A protein has these predicted regions:
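Forkhead-associated
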Residues: 5, 9-110
Length: 111
């Protein structure tokens, strides 16, 4: 089985502030604490929010109702806000929605 690396970056004002490439299943978190993968000011997310976490067959991407941007899952580009609002699969609690992601998926997400 081929390992697919996961690349995530924190971009602010079109500048890469941090870039992480992982090859083993690892949570990618955003939050105010120094323990977060990407440290950000309080933006209304739970502390150390796991935006990406290992799932049963890869990774799970969790998006919140106040996030914006574009994701491409299984070759289909979708608006983040529309994706979170439409709760036909991958439901999450209280304004969040999770979906499995694979090696060819991508996204640009505004927190």
């Amino acid at each position: 089985m081929t390992t697919v690396a996961l690349r995530t970056a924190l971009i602010w004002n079109d500048e890469v502030m941090d870039d992480v490439v992982i090859e083993k299943p690892t949570r990618i978190t955003v939050g105010r604490s120094g323990k977060a993968t990407f440290v950000v000011p309080d933006i209304g997310l739970p502390p150390d929010f796991a935006i990406v976490r290992p799932g049963n067959r890869g990774y799970l991407l969790t998006l919140g109702e106040h996030m914006r941007g574009t994701i491409c899952i299984d070759g289909e580009e979708r608006d983040v806000a529309d994706f979170v609002r439409r709760r036909d699969d991958g439901d999450g609690p209280g304004g969040f929605r999770a979906t499995p992601i694979s090696g060819r998926d991508w996204g640009v997400i505004n927190l």
